[in-house]
């Protein structure tokens, strides 16, 4: 399936709710973001409106961060992504230290948000939809 169709197709299958790129307002863990040629998944949102994301490119998979909503490149999400990549994936981080994505990641991607009510294919037993990116990463990497 082409990348730009993924968010809408997943929603059409009854797995969640679709939002066009102009309707995206926030990011929750698991949000599928799709545009022409690329798909990424949100890990969570930070207080400055930036998002920690998980994406794959030809070299491999990486945690990365978007700019803050105000356009500031040195966002909370970029700092979190750098910290986790450097700590848990040091060889990968040494080879690919840039964990910053551009503002297009916030404006040019449609969104599919999972239905976590139990009526579809997903639930949220950890209640990640209510947590910040920092809290989610700490839980995923067992920093309790």
Where are these regions (language model features)?
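...with weaker cross-activation on analogous glycine-rich loops/strands in unrelated enzymes
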Residues: 2-71
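Low-complexity, Gly/Ser/Thr/Pro-rich intrinsically disordered linker/tail segments
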Residues: 68-144
């Amino acid at each position: 399936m082409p990348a730009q169709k993924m968010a809408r197709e997943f929603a059409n299958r009854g797995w969640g709710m679709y939002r066009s790129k102009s309707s995206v307002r926030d990011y929750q863990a698991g949000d599928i973001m799709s545009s022409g040629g690329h798909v990424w998944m949100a890990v969570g949102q930070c207080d400055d409106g930036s998002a920690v994301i998980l994406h794959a490119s030809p070299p491999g998979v990486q945690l990365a961060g978007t700019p803050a909503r105000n356009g500031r490149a040195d966002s909370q999400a970029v700092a979190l992504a750098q910290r986790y990549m450097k700590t848990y994936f040091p060889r990968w981080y040494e080879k690919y230290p840039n964990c910053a994505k551009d503002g297009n990641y916030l404006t040019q991607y449609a969104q599919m948000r999972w239905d976590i009510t139990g009526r579809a294919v997903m639930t949220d037993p950890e209640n990640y939809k209510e947590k910040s990116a920092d809290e989610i990463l700490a839980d995923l990497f067992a920093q309790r």
